């Protein structure tokens, strides 16, 4: 309808001759088609618009229309056309000197290059990188222009442009795999957009960061954190439902990839029930949700299935694997399929029954890019299918396809197809069809490898069988797909998208309990009085507060009066979370009965780190609460956003607890219950197999703490500030429960002990149970009276919600945003009670209190509210606001103040509370009189903290250095730098020499007092040098630390390296466990220039160890890892590890004789393109199982020494290699034995490429050239020798195993290359004949070393070898020697074999 209206307007404008209106109509139609996804139609309209404006001379409008044409072509993936139109747009903008449009043009052009680079990522690595660099260049130009736009556009538009440029550059850096730079740029975009409330852009940045962490860094925790932030921003939009659903889709995908299907189900159900207006998103959500629901149902069934019912377990694991494949979580699918195979074997299944499992495994390994494993299971399937020729044929065709895809040698793939043909001949009725398919594919393979002779033979065979291969080529693929392995896939994969009533999902699946957006149910009671649900400034309702304080009766009354059960505070916590976190089992049970069961697996709001009530209970040691939740249906498989399971939280609590036998048994029983559930669904690892005891919990805790100082404990508390748990003293609670209920007035001794306990642990929960006298004294009404409501703590929020602080972890301190309860008790103590207390307090206890006070000041974990007084007469009236509402919190001060005498001469005691301030206030002490419940009116005096902590950043470590306030003027910056270095040493074992700077880079003098840095939020430390022990001493220290034996031979070599900065550990055949202390000792040995580890067995594991130290060897120029059993995974860990960009001087990389495989080529390309690879000039890859170099660039153009010998390269790879190598720079080149297959055609093609290589440059720098086994002939060698004649420093030439060479070549070499010292021509039997022997006599200069294969039968004259020997001795004197490899001449036979002619016999090997 809308389209017709636009078309009608366009026709009317055209008939009226109004070209302006026609252009406007074209623009409107183009926008309409763009929104509908009809990009071709949009292009047509925008082109018309541009033509009309161009004919009218309106250049700016023409430029804008061309930009839209370019954007449409971009969406159609026609990037070249898009670039043409946007470049036109850019030219017009420049001509008009319109900087705003010029900036937009550069940004648009950068986006086209970015998308083009993404599209080339899988096909052409070099092309992709080129496009990404162009994108970066254009985005940077766009960024530079923004600064010149001041005054032309508003400040907000300018900032929006700047932030978008930073985001775009960040995305480019992500695709260039410069992840750290990408994060830095996106962070800049986030800061600008958040500061200036550009929420749409902020949301986009958070989503980009989330995808970066999950897709590139595989860090689900960070990805979820950014996703949660995006979710908070999405709630600000007018179209928030659409944005929220988009964000929830991303969050669900992250959880699916992490294998947390229960959490993904909650998120997708929430998204489904929001009913996004975007149809594509709605279909995607529904499809994903159906699959996830079925996976969760299968997991539930799996938990209930007997562990010996192998047949049922096999079926369930198969369903789970299929579901994970549909969700594209192939890693998890492989885990389930392996378990399926295990259960099939336990069920005594064998033979054909295993085929579906092998099919599932190979398909999934193939989808996951693990082709070697896929081939392994394909061959197993083939072994079982040999009696079924058609199935065996399909399997072999798949094997050949994968081998061809992985660039396996031609003959390997050829042999597989030959086997397939033999199986096709046995296939009976479908034999002809299968033979056609095999022949078509085999012919395609031969043509790809230029096997013309084989193609002709195959076509002749096909013709003899009545098959026209040209005709069958077009239909071969269709028949293959219809008759191939598709049936097996369909049988193996159930229909996961069949009908399932999503409306049956309950609210418990939705986890969408944000009651603030829904009308609250209000219950009308007698007298039309209703319960008004109020929230304090933390968002806590009366029910939250009652659950925190453990008031069961109040909880029951609030619910009966209509209080919503599932209501969130500002941070996202439910009352159920609070009750579980504080361990009130009766309250938990009541809440579950009254409607909280729907939220039993709730993960809180976006600020709650995905913590469920069950995790709350487990991590705080409330075992009975955890058992209750499990009995009522809590899902133990739900993980937090930090990927922690309930069992991990339980074990973390157990490490800090001492349990008696009964408690230990309860803990072990609960743990076993959780472990049984988690292990069945494949979550728990073997390390969690045994429960902790008091003994090993202490040991583990000691190992984790190690040698941490008090201040490091504070650092740990800050580091864990985003986590939370409630410290709970179990023994104290039990003690409190045993007290006599009738005793309402404690004795003085008990009061004294209570005071001492609070002084020692000011943050500890009150262990005494709340007094029940008041509750028993009065009969409760059905309603809350005005006096029963703690009016001081309730303030109607008319300012807007204050973000509730996240729960934090501070060791033994409370790590919860909920308020702690303290009773303020009037103590009847003597007048000199202060002196007695101070004398009774040991010095170490005082220091312990100081430490805890510092922790409280640092963490400021929560605002802690007071309980009602236990006195029946204490009541408070409602005031407008209280200190607590202003953000203050309370805990007991470390020491009481002195008493004051009353007017009548009696002594009255004043109890003291220190109210912890927020960031804008000082500490306030409030004095409480025993005779009154209200504070005494005294002047509040600020009390400064006794210590000041400086934050210092050293590389990637953040340190806190506390200093007593009174010493600030006596300590200088030098002391602070030394102390920070000492603490860094405790963390890493290395001591740096530091210079401290401000955050913006201004350096302090060493003599400056430390007080000048008080205003700095963080100090940056630059490392001037390292205090490092000699390498051999470091090795001994590492061996001692790791409890390994010191190898004296290694130690001696390490000592030698100190003299020449070259560490040579070649030929020791050490494995990874032996090299680990060596690699740790290498950390920060910055003067080391050469590291030679040739001929060891470090493998991939050793590479991971070395990768930690390698970036710190800043002067390293040569890394030799020849013959170390290193694969592609080890190479990736080594070259793509964090910090490798700092290794900017590495010139030589020797990886010879390692099974790297083709997968390593991408890794090497990435490394060579990085800053660390820019200095690389020597690359050695001999015998590394390489066959296909694809389009990757290993920095060939800048190499001076290159060795890729003994790798069977394809002709296409050789062509690309010779095109990229630079003969102007090369000094050493080894291309021996790289051709494949070994036929005349490939030899000729390789020789032609070699000639092209030498012709492409000056060849002046060559010192050594090795071309053995390259299929060279005389013509090729003539051309090559002509070019090598320019290399005046040429020392060695190896042309061995080129059997087509004749004596003519030897003549060329001796004439053209007189500077040659070594000539190797082994197995070139036709090289030396009578003519060449005479030529040798005439030459004045010969190579000093000549290795030839000689056949005396070639010579017509007798005594050819004697003549040769005399020539040699005449040239080089008595030291010259001729060596043979057999004694045939001594027994009168003619000699045939290797002949070595040496100028100096002492050089003989």
Curated annotation (Swiss-Prot):
PROSITE patterns: ANK_REP_REGION (PS50297), ANK_REPEAT (PS50088), TPR (PS50005), TPR_REGION (PS50293). Gene3D superfamilies: Ankyrin repeat-containing domain, Ribonuclease Inhibitor, Tetratricopeptide repeat domain. Residues 841-850 have a biased composition (Polar residues). Coiled coil: none annotated. Keywords: ANK repeat, Chromatin regulator, Chromosome, DNA damage, DNA repair, Leucine-rich repeat, Nucleus, Phosphoprotein, Repeat, TPR repeat. Residues 813-822 have a biased composition (Basic and acidic residues). ANK repeats lie at residues 538-567, 571-600, 609-638. GO terms for molecular function: histone binding. GO terms for cellular component: nuclear replication fork; nucleoplasm. It is found in: Nucleus, Nucleoplasm; Chromosome. One of its GO terms (biological process) is double-strand break repair via homologous recombination. LRR repeats lie at residues 153-181, 439-465, 1085-1108, 1113-1137, 1143-1166, 1186-1211, 1287-1311, 1333-1357. Residues 469-483 have a biased composition (Acidic residues). Residues 465-535, 695-753, 806-827, 841-880 are annotated as: Disordered. The modification Phosphoserine is found at residues 707, 709, 893, 895, 899, 902. Its main location: nucleus. Belongs to the Tonsoku family. This is Tonsoku-like protein.
């Amino acid at each position: 309808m809308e389209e017709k209206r636009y078309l009608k307007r366009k026709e009317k404008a055209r008939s009226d001759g109004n070209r302006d209106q026609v252009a406007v109509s074209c623009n409107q139609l183009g926008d309409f088609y763009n929104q509908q996804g009809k990009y071709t139609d949009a292009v047509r309209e925008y082109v018309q618009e541009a033509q009309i404006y161009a004919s009218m001379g309106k250049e700016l409008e023409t430029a804008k229309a061309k930009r839209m044409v370019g954007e449409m072509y971009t969406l159609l993936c026609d990037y070249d056309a898009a670039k043409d139109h946007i470049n036109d747009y850019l030219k017009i903008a420049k001509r008009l000197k319109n900087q705003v449009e010029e900036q937009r043009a550069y940004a648009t052009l950068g986006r086209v290059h970015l998308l083009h680079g993404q599209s080339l990522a899988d096909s052409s690595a070099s092309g992709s990188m080129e496009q990404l660099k162009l994108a970066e260049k254009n985005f940077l130009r766009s960024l530079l222009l923004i600064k010149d736009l001041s005054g032309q556009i508003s400040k907000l538009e300018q900032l929006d442009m700047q932030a978008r440029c930073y985001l775009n550059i960040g995305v480019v850096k992500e695709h260039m795999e410069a992840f750290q730079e990408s994060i830095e740029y996106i962070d800049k975009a986030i800061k600008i957009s958040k500061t200036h409330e550009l929420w749409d852009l902020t949301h986009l940045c958070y989503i980009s960061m989330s995808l970066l962490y999950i897709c590139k860094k595989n860090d689900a925790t960070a990805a979820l954190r950014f996703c949660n932030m995006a979710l908070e921003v999405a709630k600000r939009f007018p179209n928030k439902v659409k944005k929220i659903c988009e964000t929830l889709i991303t969050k669900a995908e992250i959880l699916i990839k992490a294998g947390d299907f229960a959490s993904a189900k909650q998120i997708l159900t929430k998204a489904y029930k929001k009913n996004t207006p975007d149809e594509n998103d709605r279909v995607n959500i529904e499809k994903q949700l159906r699959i996830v629901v079925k996976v969760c149902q299968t997991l539930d069934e799996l938990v209930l299935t007997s562990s010996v019912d192998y047949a049922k377990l096999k079926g369930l694991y198969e369903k789970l694997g299929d579901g994970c494949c549909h969700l594209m979580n192939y890693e998890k699918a492989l885990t389930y399929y392996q378990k399926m195979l295990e259960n099939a074997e336990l069920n005594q299944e064998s033979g054909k029954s295993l085929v579906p499992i092998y099919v599932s495994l190979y398909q999934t390994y193939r989808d996951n890019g693990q082709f070697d494993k896929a081939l392994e299971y394909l061959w197993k399937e083939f072994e079982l299918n040999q009696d079924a020729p058609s199935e065996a044929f399909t399997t072999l065709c798949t094997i050949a396809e994968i081998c061809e895809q992985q660039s396996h040698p031609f003959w390997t793939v050829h042999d597989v197809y030959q086997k397939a043909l033999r199986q096709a001949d046995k296939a009976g009725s479908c034999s002809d069809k299968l033979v056609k398919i095999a022949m078509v594919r085999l012919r395609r393979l031969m043509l790809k490898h230029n096997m013309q002779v084989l193609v002709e033979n195959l076509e002749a065979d096909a013709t003899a069988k009545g098959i026209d291969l040209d005709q069958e080529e077009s239909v071969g693929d269709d028949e293959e797909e219809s008759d191939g392995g598709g049936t097996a896939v369909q049988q193996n994969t159930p229909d996961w998208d069949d009908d399932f009533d999503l409306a049956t999902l309950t609210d418990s699946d939705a986890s969408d309990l944000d009651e603030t957006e829904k009308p609250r149910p209000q219950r009308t009671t007698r007298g039309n009085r209703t319960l008004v649900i109020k929230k304090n400034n933390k968002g806590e309702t009366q029910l939250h507060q009652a659950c925190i304080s453990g008031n069961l009766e109040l909880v029951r009354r609030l619910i009966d009066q209509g209080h919503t059960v599932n209501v969130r505070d500002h941070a996202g916590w439910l009352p159920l979370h609070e009750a579980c976190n504080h361990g009130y089992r009766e309250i938990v049970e009541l809440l579950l009965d009254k409607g909280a069961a729907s939220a039993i697996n709730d993960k809180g709001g976006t600020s709650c780190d995905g913590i469920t009530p069950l995790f709350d209970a487990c991590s705080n040691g409330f075992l009975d609460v955890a058992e209750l939740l499990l009995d009522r249906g809590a899902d133990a498989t739900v993980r937090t956003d930090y990927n922690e399971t309930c069992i991990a939280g339980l074990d973390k609590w157990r490490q800090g607890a001492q349990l008696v036998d009964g408690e230990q048994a309860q803990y072990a029983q609960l743990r076993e219950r959780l472990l049984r559930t988690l292990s069945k669904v494949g979550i728990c690892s073997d390390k969690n197999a045994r429960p902790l005891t008091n003994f090993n919990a202490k040991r583990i805790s000691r190992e984790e703490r190690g040698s941490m100082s008090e201040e490091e404990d504070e650092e740990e508390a800050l580091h864990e500030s985003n986590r939370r748990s409630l410290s709970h003293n179990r023994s104290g609670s039990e003690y409190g429960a045993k007290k006599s209920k009738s005793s309402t007035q404690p004795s003085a001794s008990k009061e004294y002990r209570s005071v001492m306990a609070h002084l020692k642990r000011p943050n500890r929960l009150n262990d005494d149970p709340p007094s029940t006298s008041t509750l028993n004294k009065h009969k409760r009404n059905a309603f809350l009276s005005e006096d029963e409501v703690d009016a001081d703590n309730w303030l109607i929020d008319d300012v807007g919600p204050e973000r509730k602080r996240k729960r934090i972890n501070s060791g033994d301190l409370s790590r919860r945003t909920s308020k702690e309860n303290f009773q303020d008790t009037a103590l009847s103590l003597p007048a000199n009670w202060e002196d007695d207390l101070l004398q009774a307090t040991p010095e170490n206890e005082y220091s312990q209190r100081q430490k805890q006070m510092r922790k409280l000041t640092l963490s400021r974990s929560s605002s802690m509210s007071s309980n009602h007084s236990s006195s029946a007469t204490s009541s408070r009236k409602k005031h407008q606001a209280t200190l607590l509402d202003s953000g203050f919190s309370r805990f007991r001060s470390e020491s009481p103040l002195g008493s004051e005498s009353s007017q009548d001469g009696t002594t009255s005691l004043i109890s003291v509370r220190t109210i912890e301030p927020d960031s804008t206030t000082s500490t306030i002490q409030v004095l409480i009189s025993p005779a009154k419940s209200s504070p005494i009116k005294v002047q509040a005096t600020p009390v400064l903290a006794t210590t000041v902590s400086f934050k210092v950043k050293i590389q990637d470590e953040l340190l806190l250095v506390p200093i007593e306030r009174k010493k600030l003027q006596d300590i200088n910056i030098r002391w602070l730098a030394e102390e920070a270095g000492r603490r860094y040493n405790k963390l890493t074992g290395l001591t740096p020499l530091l210079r401290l700077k401000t955050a913006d880079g201004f350096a302090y003098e060493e003599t400056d007092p430390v007080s000048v840095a008080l205003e700095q939020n963080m100090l940056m430390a630059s490392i001037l040098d390292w205090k490092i022990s000699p390498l051999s001493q470091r090795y001994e220290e590492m061996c001692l630390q790791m409890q390994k034996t010191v190898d004296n031979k290694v130690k001696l070599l390490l000592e030698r390296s100190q003299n020449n900065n070259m560490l040579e550990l070649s030929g020791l055949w050490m494995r990874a466990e032996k090299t680990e202390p060596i690699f740790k000792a290498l950390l920060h040995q910055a003067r080391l220039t050469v590291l030679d580890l040739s001929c060891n067995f470090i493998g991939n594991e050793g590479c991971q160890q070395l990768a930690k130290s390698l970036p710190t060897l800043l002067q390293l120029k040569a890394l030799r890892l020849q013959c170390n059993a290193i694969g592609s995974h080890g190479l990736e860990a080594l070259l793509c590890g964090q910090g490798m960009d700092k290794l900017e001087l590495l010139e030589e990389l020797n990886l010879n004789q390692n099974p790297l495989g083709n997968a390593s080529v991408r890794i090497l390309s990435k490394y060579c393109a990085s800053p660390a690879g820019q200095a690389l000039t020597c690359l050695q890859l001999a015998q590394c199982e390489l066959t296909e170099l694809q389009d990757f660039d290993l920095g060939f153009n800048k190499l001076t020494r290159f060795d890729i010998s003994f790798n069977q390269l394809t002709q296409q790879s050789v062509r690309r290699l010779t095109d990229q190598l630079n003969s102007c720079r090369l000094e050493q080149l080894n291309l021996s034995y790289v051709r494949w297959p070994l036929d005349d055609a490939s030899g000729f093609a390789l020789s032609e490429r070699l000639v092209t290589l030498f012709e492409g440059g000056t060849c002046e720098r060559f010192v050594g050239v090795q071309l053995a086994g390259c299929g060279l002939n005389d013509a090729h060698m003539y051309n090559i020798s002509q070019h090598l004649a320019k290399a005046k420093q040429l020392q060695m030439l190896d042309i061995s195993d080129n059997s087509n060479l004749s004596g003519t070549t030897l003549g060329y070499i001796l004439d053209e290359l007189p500077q040659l010292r070594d000539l190797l021509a082994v197995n070139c039997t036709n090289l030396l004949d009578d003519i060449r022997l005479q030529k040798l006599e005439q030459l004045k200069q010969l190579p000093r070393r000549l290795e030839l294969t000689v056949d005396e039968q070639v010579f017509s004259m007798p005594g050819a070898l004697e003549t040769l020997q005399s020539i040699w001795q005449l040239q080089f004197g008595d030291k010259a020697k001729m060596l043979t490899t057999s004694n045939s001449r001594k027994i009168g036979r003619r000699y045939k074999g290797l002949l070595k002619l040496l100028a100096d016999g002492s050089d003989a090997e």
